Design a protein with these regions (language model features):
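Conserved acidic/glycine
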Residues: 1-66, 72-73, 299-301, 305-526, ...
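Short coil/turn connectors at secondary-structure junctions
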Residues: 28, 32, 53-54, 75-79, ...
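Thiamine diphosphate
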Residues: 64-68, 145-406, 412, 503, 651-816, ...
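Helix-enriched interaction subdomains in cytosolic or periplasmic regions
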Residues: 138-144, 155, 433-473, 618-622, ...
Length: 816
């Protein structure tokens, strides 16, 4: 296709050299100016890093012209899900400034100067702010939007699917048409970008396949410079061309798929044309589009970590100079008579001056507050009349801090802490002592630093889950006993009827109503835009949910079994869990991930790897109900909040009978609040999920031996026991056992740390704490395999009895 651009199923063939653009001379020269500003910014940014003003630099040089062409068709309401090469696009679309470019390099923590992430991410990781300061939605339909970037290659792809699917739902579900601050009836395109090497990742192919199936307005651009750091395309991609191997996805007479466009990264005319043509199809027909932009370059190499001269041949480097996109645009402008060399020279000079000015402004914004902070502290620390032996050491630390030309927070705080250690009680007068003043200053600065660097792991808005109080289920004498799955089904029915933003999806969720019938009949009642099936693609099921939630919907994404969550754990950990944190409260994705887990049958349908999950998804609530009533209450709670959650239904409890609450759909189970299931006085047993019923059996067995056990269902692993109820039980019993079916040292160790260290429960122990867990291996098949792999009531009994024997051997003699 070197001479033509093919648009499948449209019969359009256009010679590249026919320039039909409506862009006038001023627009072309403005594009040239912007390309040069972006290139100079890359060069100057690299210099700032290499001279020590920044820690790391990664840039988008070599990709300027294609990104300018793409920005021309990016509208208010549209969304970007891209990566760290997109600085020119962000500048051209007006979502980013040169001052912000340098503020990112310096790590400026002032949201005014670095609004995308407040200094939490390395440079060229972009985002716009979807939320007001109070955490409420802005009018995102009237602004251009960029979802928050992450570094993992292809990590932007799963969320892109959801951003595009949202447009389809906003268009086809008329109940959503009134939500004009979220969407203009689905007239938005989700733009994705990815490097050619990253298309080798599974996330890319999974997303592309799903987009082709869903037929959604997703436009993905592949920036192809021929390399993945030092690895060339021939070792990355079959046929060395992503468009060639994606040809089977192309829309044609045999069925739906993608429109596929190709162009060269240096061909301004062609790039403007294909983006205008391709995005029009994408927006108007809601069909996905792939733009493969090849013959791009990377003039300064991958990043500031090294030079591409180490792995590119002299011939390749010379080719990159000849085919540099800005040089080619300059040649084209001169050749066509749009402007002469002198005029372009002036544009280039003005661009360089503009970038230098932006750098100076950004640096002053960053360094002045730090210099002031340093000087204020030194002034405070100079107030002393003491002549003790440590004064010289204090003076030395102050001198070293004073001569640092460009101090950072670490320099100042580290010096202050070292000085505090050396201050004696006689320094200054007691009422205004140096120790008191420095301590107060440090406390204030540490609090401020926590706000700057550690806020917004969870929601700070008025809709935070922790603020939602519980409402108990209400029962009457006539409340029927039904299988637990019916409680969930009726609860979902009430949710779908009440909230038009809620959409539920997953494998087998739609037509058959879920593998355990918890959504039975709901697709027929509410339609395929509210509850629907997906393919077997866990990573993009979660990513789909992330993107939908970022656009203001309330998605519920089902992962059929907890064991298969691992396919999507990277998306949860790197994208969903970090979103509010990495944007410092600028974006949110209140996604509910529902799954079923714990013991049932065989290695891959009996998993309970909670420690792996809770330690990788901080930022997501992890809720572990013991039955379907508690699960329903958690769904109701989280749908009132603006935070993401993973809710794990007990896999072996769908057929167990539970009373149907009279207030179905309205009762709420609060997060972070355990429930005491059995009161006792001798020992505390702490567990959750499917283990609760096993523990209840063990409690009955223990009673026969005069042991009174207090059984506590934690219900919520993250957050965990926020009111320290377990500690109060331990104060009474002075003995504790933590029980679950995770691996040894897993979630039981997590719970133990929370109670003994964080809650200071250690001081109330009469004997060592115990854990009862599964074996280190996966659960074997069959009843006996489960019995000898997972902990059972007898294991709990034995652990408790042995502990009681250790405390009082005469009352509890050995029986084992």
């Amino acid at each position: 296709m070197s001479g033509q651009v093919k648009v499948a199923n449209e019969g359009i063939k256009t010679n590249k050299r026919v320039y039909e653009s409506n862009h006038n001379r001023a627009e072309i020269l403005d594009d040239y100016r912007l390309a040069n500003e972006s290139r100079y910014a890359s060069q100057l940014g690299r210099r700032e890093v290499l001279t020590g003003k920044g820690k790391f630099g990664i840039f988008g040089d070599g990709k300027e012209i294609a990104q300018i062409a793409m920005a021309k068709v990016f509208r208010e309401g549209d969304w970007r899900s891209g990566y760290y090469r997109d600085q020119t696009f962000m500048l051209a679309a007006g979502m980013f400034t040169l001052e912000e470019f340098f503020a990112q390099i310096y790590g400026d923590t002032d949201i005014e100067f670095n609004p995308g992430n407040g200094g939490r991410l390395m440079n060229n990781h972009f985002s716009t702010r979807s939320l007001n300061e109070d955490g409420e939605w802005k009018n995102i339909a009237c602004q251009k939007n960029s979802s928050a970037d992450i570094s993992p290659t292809a990590g932007q792809m799963p969320r892109l699917l959801g951003l595009a699917l949202a447009s389809k739902l906003f268009k086809e579900n008329t109940e959503l048409h009134s939500l004009t601050s979220l969407s203009g009836k689905g007239n938005e395109v989700a733009f994705g970008t990815i490097g050619d090497a990253s298309t080798s990742e599974g996330h890319f192919f999974e997303t592309m396949n799903a987009a082709g199936v869903l037929q959604i307005p997703m436009a993905i651009s592949v920036w192809d410079d021929g390399w993945g750091i030092s690895v060339p395309n021939k070792l990355q991609t079959t046929k060395q061309s992503i468009s060639a191997i994606m040809a089977g996805f192309e829309k044609d007479e045999n069925g739906d798929g993608f429109h596929i466009f190709q162009a060269k990264g240096w061909d301004y005319e062609d790039l403007c044309r294909i983006y205008k043509q391709g995005i029009a199809l994408c927006r108007e027909q809601h069909v996905p589009v792939l733009f493969h932009v090849s013959e791009m370059t990377q003039p300064s190499g991958h990043s500031t970590s090294g030079s591409h001269e180490r792995y590119k041949s002299a011939e390749r480097l010379e080719w990159e100079k000849s085919f540099d996109c800005i040089s080619r645009m300059r040649d084209w402008i001169i050749k066509t008579g749009i402007a002469g060399a002198a005029e372009l020279d002036k544009i280039e000079g003005d661009a360089a001056d503009r970038v230098k000015k932006a750098k100076r402004t950004a640096w002053e914004n960053y360094i002045k507050p730090l210099l002031q902070k340093r000087d204020d502290f030194l002034k405070l620390a100079d107030v002393t009349t003491c002549n003790c032996a440590k004064t010289a050491k204090i003076d030395h630390i102050k001198h070293d801090l004073r001569i640092i030309a460009e101090p950072n927070r670490k320099d100042i705080m580290s010096s202050a802490k070292k000085i505090l250690r050396l201050i004696c009680n006689s320094c200054s007068n007691p009422a205004n002592s140096l120790k008191i003043n420095v301590t107060a200053w440090l406390d204030k600065e540490m609090a401020e630093s926590r706000r700057i660097y550690s806020s917004h792991l969870y929601s700070a808005s008025g809709e935070a889950a922790a603020l939602i109080r519980g409402i108990k289920p209400v029962y009457s004498p006539d409340s029927p006993e039904v299988p637990g799955r019916e409680v969930l089904r009726e609860n979902w029915d009430h949710i779908l009827a009440r909230n038009s933003k809620v959409v539920i999806f997953g494998e087998d969720v739609g037509k058959i109503g879920g593998v355990n019938q918890t959504y039975e009949g709901l697709q027929a009642k509410y339609g395929e835009n509210r509850i629907f099936d997906t393919g077997i693609r866990e990573a993009t099921i979660i990513g789909q949910g992330v993107g939908l939630a970022m656009r203001g919907l309330r998605p519920v994404a089902e992962i059929q079994y907890f064991d298969y969550l691992l396919y999507g754990l990277q998306v949860m950990s790197d994208d969903l869990a970090t979103l509010q944190y990495r944007t410092r409260g600028g974006q949110k994705a209140p996604l509910i991930i529902t799954t079923r887990g714990h013991r049932l049958e065989g290695i891959w349908h009996s998993g309970s790897p909670l420690s792996m999950v809770i330690n990788s998804v901080r930022g997501v609530h992890v809720l572990v109900p013991r039955d379907m009533t508690r699960a329903a209450g958690f769904y109701n709670t989280m749908l009132l909040s603006d935070e993401p959650a993973l809710i794990i239904e007990p896999l072996n409890a769908y057929r167990l009978k539970e009373k149907m609450p009279d207030n179905i759909g309205e009762f709420l189970v609060p997060v972070g609040i355990p429930e005491i299931i059995e009161k006792g006085s001798d020992i505390t047993i702490v567990t959750y999920g499917s283990c609760v019923r096993i523990a209840q059996d063990a409690v009955l067995q223990l009673r026969d031996f005069a042991i009174s056990a207090e059984l506590i269902d934690v219900q919520s692993l993250e957050p965990f026991d926020v009111n320290h109820q377990i500690l109060e039980s331990l104060k009474k019993t002075n003995k504790i056992v933590f029980f679950d079916e995770d691996v040894p040292g897993g979630a039981t160790a997590y719970m133990m740390q929370k109670v003994l260290e964080e809650q200071k429960g250690y001081y109330y122990l009469d004997c060592e704490p115990r854990t009862v867990t599964a074996q280190a291996h996966r659960a074997a098949y069959g009843t006996d395999g489960d019995y000898f792999s997972n902990p059972n009531a007898e294991d709990v009994f034995e652990a408790v009895y042995k502990l009681m024997h250790d405390v009082n051997p005469s009352m509890y003699p050995k029986i084992f």
